[in-house]
Amino acid sequence: LFLGITFNYGLILGWTSVTNQINVIPILLYVGAIFWTLGYDTIYGYQDIKDDEIIGLKSTSIKFKENPKTFLKVCYLIFFTILLSVGILMKLNFIYYIFLLMVILHLYNFQIKRLNIEKQLSCLNIFKSNNLLGLIIFIGLIIGKQNF
């Protein structure tokens, strides 16, 4: 949670520096990104969960190791719902929603369904895929603002 709160604060800073104002949209994006980060950081944590347990670390990977996919579904559903809300509030065009479809398909089909917390490489590959996912969201937001 702390990583998501600190890491994603740049959303609000970037938004305000470009628009010179603050409104509900960057705050929604910030909250959504926190839940996205909670998800992918939990996946990342499964790579070395045994070491974390030995040293007594308190992490979402340890807390939800018995049912990680349920936790990820909740995090990613909140993230997706916020992205959907942002699209509506910003009056983005239909192409944004096509990009959102790619986002939810990736989160569910690639990340949640394929996750095997017993295999480090599975966790690493899924974690790294979030880089591409961020690009898809960014492009969707840019194209979604265009008038066709």
Where are these regions (language model features)?
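Multi-pass alpha-helical membrane architecture of UbiA-family
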Residues: 1-148
